[in-house]
Amino acid sequence: MAYPNPAGIKRVAVLTSGGDAPGMNAAIRAVVRTGAQQGIEVVGVRRGFSGLHRGEVQLLGPRDVANTIQRGGTILLTARSHTWRSPEGRAKGAAVLREWGVDGLVVIGGDGSFHGGYFLQEEHGIPVIGVPGTIDNDLYGTDHTIGYFTAVETALEAVDKLRDTGASHERIFVIEVMGRHAGHIALDVAVAGGAEEVFIPEDKKPIGDVVNIVKDSIAKGKRGSIIIVAEGYDGGAEAVAQAIHAGTGLETRVSILGHIQRGGTPVSSDRILASRLGEAAVYALMDGKKGVMVGRIGGGIAYTPLHETWEKRKDVSRDLYRCAKMLSI
């Protein structure tokens, strides 16, 4: 079905930048296939902004993205670029886009990637649309980010297995999940995994509180405890485990899940979200929009200025936090 194209878009570039997230390939696929359906050529930039200023660009067609929707990672590869932080680096990238006749750029990534796209547009006038791709779910302007659902499922699977062995040995496990600045993953995993306690960056409660929580769990007859800690909480899982051992003398184990949360086959929710947002990004350029992130709020597509995605804070659900406390008896 033809979509109006008042902006006269003929060629679009797409790149992935920063940390990878499950579902990025589904977003790339959606951009390419939506473009093809609307008579718009799509070029892919390899290795993000790092590859852009080096001219790592190639045409992409529907067959190039076939059999990719189920794959983790990103077929375009990703990298962090120090060169892009300089005006000279961005000028070189802009020249590459002009050389390829690009009318607009779709950036799939997090706030760092959006910074790069924002300054490219401000300095060189190339329309940029952001697509939220980060497992942390910390971008303002969308209910969820691409990769978040899969990261939660990956972490939860590990928590379930650690709970089995923890209960068998009557042992405490302190499990660290990703989330440098936000506790979305930690909070969801804590509720879904039945954790006794959760520590998130948004809540600066004293680390010593965990000692009383563990003692209370033992008094209630629990054979083991699961404590979830977001990596952004002061001191991380190691500090929490040390506090428990110092205050109780109990055997405590730390498990840092790390980068495993970024990998793996994306779950259906991430594939669907990525497909919708990739399509919406192309339509946004055709509508003449620029400097915005396409997100999903309440089931509909929302457009948020790129600078607001990092200037405004996306809070964790206080209702869910209350629920975690209520159920940890």
Swiss-Prot record:
**Active site, UniProt feature:** 136
Q: What SUPFAM superfamilies does the database record attribute to this sequence?
A: Phosphofructokinase
Q: State the superkingdom.
A: Bacteria
Give the residues the record marks as binding ADP.
29-33, 163, 194-196, 220, 222-224
Where is the protein found, in the record's own terms? Cytoplasm
The pathway entry for this protein reads as:
Carbohydrate degradation; glycolysis; D-glyceraldehyde 3-phosphate and glycerone phosphate from D-glucose: step 3/4
Q: Which GO molecular function entries does the Swiss-Prot or TrEMBL record give? A: 6-phosphofructokinase activity; ATP binding; fructose-6-phosphate binding; metal ion binding
Needed cofactors, names only, are: Mg(2+)
- Main subcellular localization, coarse class? cytoplasm
Keywords carried by this UniProt record: Allosteric enzyme, ATP-binding, Cytoplasm, Glycolysis, Kinase, Magnesium, Metal-binding, Nucleotide-binding, Transferase
Residues annotated for ATP binding in this entry: 19, 80-81, 110-113
Query: Any known activators or inhibitors?
Result: Allosterically activated by ADP and other diphosphonucleosides, and allosterically inhibited by phosphoenolpyruvate.
> Which of this chain's residues are annotated to bind Mg(2+)?
111
Record's catalysed reaction(s) = beta-D-fructose 6-phosphate + ATP = beta-D-fructose 1,6-bisphosphate + ADP + H(+)
Gene Ontology terms: cellular component: 6-phosphofructokinase complex
By its UniProt entry, which InterPro entries does this protein fall under?
A: ATP_PFK, ATP_PFK_prok-type, PFKA_ATP_prok, Phosphofructokinase_CS, Phosphofructokinase_dom, PKF_sf
Instruction: Please tell me where substrate binds in this chain.
Output: 134-136, 171, 178-180, 231, 253, 259-262
Q: What is its EC number?
A: 2.7.1.11
Please state which protein family the record places this protein in: Belongs to the phosphofructokinase type A (PFKA) family. ATP-dependent PFK group I subfamily. Prokaryotic clade 'B1' sub-subfamily.
Question: How does it associate, per the subunit comment?
Answer: Homotetramer.
PANTHER family associated with the record:
ATP-DEPENDENT 6-PHOSPHOFRUCTOKINASE, PHOSPHOFRUCTOKINASE
Its job: Catalyzes the phosphorylation of D-fructose 6-phosphate to fructose 1,6-bisphosphate by ATP, the first committing step of glycolysis.
This chain belongs to which protein, by name?
Answer: ATP-dependent 6-phosphofructokinase
